[in-house]
């Protein structure tokens, strides 16, 4: 496919061409998902089937909503889904959405009302600059913040899944995860672009370390 818009830079033109020709972009359109990211969560749920037993779920960085759609289609029993994003998200049946930052009082109020959660998900991506050190710090900060939320609001036995980027050392964060969860691993779905450094941290069965 040729991209003829002359106002686009070569870089933008290449990105657009790759996007419209992407297998998962086409598939998401055909299967009525809001974005290709849906297939990443499908693969995660398939590999880590215990996640499908979740009933009270938090989706951080939820917009445009494809992960909520996957949860609705793959978890068939009664459930509650709280979706959180700074970006607006069109309504999804069965999903409660709050348009705020997870440091806002509105989020804290909702989370405290609905806790404990048995699954907390994050597909948040930082605004990458192309500078490795800066991008690592941004990615690391997001991972630290989402892990803090998981440790605060997950029930014992609950699970945490978060995107991060392999741009630097996070061994201290992994140590915290291993201290607080029975099983900790990393997983890169086949639907994640090969050239992307993104990968997902999978933390299963939060420990009752206070007992």
Q: At which residue positions do the language-model features occur?
A:
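A generic alpha-to-beta junction signature in SAM-dependent methyltransferases
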Residues: 51, 75-76, 153-154
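S-adenosyl-L-methionine
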Residues: 84-129
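Class I S-adenosyl-L-methionine
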Residues: 10, 166-211
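Glycine-centered, small-residue-biased loops immediately flanking beta-strands
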Residues: 55, 79, 158
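Class I SAM-dependent methyltransferase Rossmann-like catalytic core
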Residues: 1-53
């Amino acid at each position: 496919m040729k991209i003829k818009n002359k106002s686009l830079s070569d870089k933008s033109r290449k990105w657009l061409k790759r996007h419209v020709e992407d297998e998962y972009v086409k598939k998401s359109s055909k299967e009525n998902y809001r974005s290709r990211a849906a297939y990443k969560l499908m693969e995660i749920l398939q590999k880590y089937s215990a996640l499908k037993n979740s009933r009270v779920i938090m989706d951080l960085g939820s917009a445009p909503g494809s992960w909520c759609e996957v949860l609705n289609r793959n978890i068939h029993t009664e459930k509650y889904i709280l979706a959180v994003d700074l970006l607006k998200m069109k309504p999804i049946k069965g999903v409660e959405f709050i348009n705020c930052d997870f440091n806002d009082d509105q989020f804290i109020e909702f989370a405290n009302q609905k806790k404990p959660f048995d699954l907390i998900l994050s597909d948040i991506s930082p605004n990458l600059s192309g500078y490795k050190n800066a991008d690592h710090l941004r990615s690391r900060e997001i991972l630290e913040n989402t892990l803090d939320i998981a440790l605060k609001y997950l029930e014992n036995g609950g699970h945490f899944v978060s995107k991060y980027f392999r741009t630097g050392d996070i061994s201290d964060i992994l140590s915290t995860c291993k201290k607080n969860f029975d099983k900790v691993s990393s997983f890169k779905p086949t639907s994640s672009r090969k050239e992307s450094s993104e990968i997902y941290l999978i933390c299963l069965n939060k420990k009752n370390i206070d007992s």
